[in-house]
């Protein structure tokens, strides 16, 4: 841990390679097909994730569907918050370095029109997302959901083909807010050969549990 970081956890001497060996005990797992905001999940992506979830069920885990915890208005508020934060962080860079991030600059520039009250309202919105995500996980040991709910966009694009660069994060950014451990496992390819990932999310500080579940799936 870094002494300058008050959120850092104490050092834990763990041999992860040894610790994650062995089949995990039966767990209660929630499956989120649609988190509630962002683009409508692609059916081909969902089918691949459903096949992967069956593997966890065959291991003896209890699988339950989770009702979408969010709605599209939540995503707008979250994006506004991150635009404002990014704008402030970009202001710390030299003009030379800032010019290297044209896409992010253009995206964050929208926040120049937001007021201080707007920003704090958006901040409170992200805290509400955090609370609702914890409530959605209540009673589950792990959550499973598509890492990205649609196939990869064109490699030369910074985001979706319509210019939306925030929606690709819709299934992942909330776990930065909650500080839950999460990882993405490959779970197949679309008919066009594009990779699809299944995200495994654990309870706060249960990094080992997430790694165990991932290894069990991989094996």
Q: What is each residue range found by the language model?
A:
Residues 35, 148-151:
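Short glycine-rich anion-binding loops that position phosphate/pyrophosphate groups of nucleotides
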Residues 61-78, 106-110:
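Short connector loops at secondary-structure junctions
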Residues 1-32, 38-39, 49-59, 120, ...:
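Structural helix-boundary/capping segments
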Residues 41, 75, 153-156, 194:
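Short glycine-/acidic-enriched loop or helix-start segments at secondary-structure transitions
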Residues 8, 77, 82, 121, ...:
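Short, surface-exposed loop/helix-turn segments at secondary-structure junctions
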Residues 41-67, 90-96, 119, 123-140:
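Acyltransferase
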Residues 21-33, 80-134, 184-195:
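Short helix-loop capping/hinge segments that flank enzyme active sites or metal/cofactor-binding pockets
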């Amino acid at each position: 841990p870094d002494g300058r970081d008050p959120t850092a956890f104490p050092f834990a001497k763990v041999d992860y390679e040894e610790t994650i060996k062995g089949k995990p005990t039966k767990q209660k797992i929630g499956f989120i097909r649609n988190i509630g905001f962002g683009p409508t999940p692609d059916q081909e992506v969902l089918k691949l994730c459903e096949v992967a979830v069956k593997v966890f069920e065959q291991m003896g885990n209890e699988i339950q569907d989770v009702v979408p915890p969010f709605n599209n208005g939540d995503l707008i508020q979250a994006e506004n918050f991150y635009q404002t934060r990014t704008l402030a962080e970009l202001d710390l860079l030299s003009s030379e370095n800032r010019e290297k991030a044209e896409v992010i600059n253009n995206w964050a520039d929208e926040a120049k029109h937001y007021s201080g009250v707007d920003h704090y309202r958006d901040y409170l919105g992200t805290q509400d997302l955090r609370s609702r995500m914890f409530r959605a996980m209540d009673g589950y040991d792990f959550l499973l959901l598509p890492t990205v709910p649609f196939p990869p966009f064109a490699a030369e694009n910074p985001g979706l083909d319509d210019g939306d660069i925030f929606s690709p994060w819709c299934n992942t950014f909330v776990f930065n807010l909650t500080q839950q451990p999460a990882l993405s496992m490959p779970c197949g390819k679309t008919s066009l050969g594009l990779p699809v990932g299944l995200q495994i999310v654990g309870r706060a500080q249960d990094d080992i549990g997430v790694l165990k579940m991932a290894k069990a799936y991989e094996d």
